[in-house]
């Protein structure tokens, strides 16, 4: 693990943080809009971009996790109580689980879809379905519910933890 005595996160960590945060906000808004639209070509296009940005979030989050595991985070303030430090560490872990779990559940849902619509990231890069997941209406429905509930959990969790300072 790269060691630093800096009281701040690195520029790369900060950039990843804000880039992923903005992408997630866009995904939440886009997800809400597209699920409330009637069937149309525009809805199909929004779904395709939603998948593209979701995979982008997944890849950036995995990179961010590797970066975090190989670069020491700044120490939490000494004024924080031990239980507050534990909560801060658990909160970070929960966010990583959600940043990776939500896109994975979406990718799995698309992979299980009986519609078998191919994914092309930003209309350019073919993206495969997850190997081993076969089309199934019941599995797709379960994964859709998981995807939506994880997103609701992420929004709720953010609202609960945003006022706290770690």
Question: Each predicted region: which residue ranges?
Answer:
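Transmembrane alpha-helical insertion/packing segments
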Residues: 2-63
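Conserved histidines in hydrophobic membrane contexts and catalytic metal-binding motifs
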Residues: 46, 50, 100, 147
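Juxtamembrane helix-capping/reentrant segments at transmembrane boundaries
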Residues: 47, 77-91
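Membrane-helix interface/capping segments
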Residues: 65-81
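Hydrophobic alpha-helical membrane-insertion segments
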Residues: 91-113
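Hydrophobic alpha-helical transmembrane segments
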Residues: 133-156
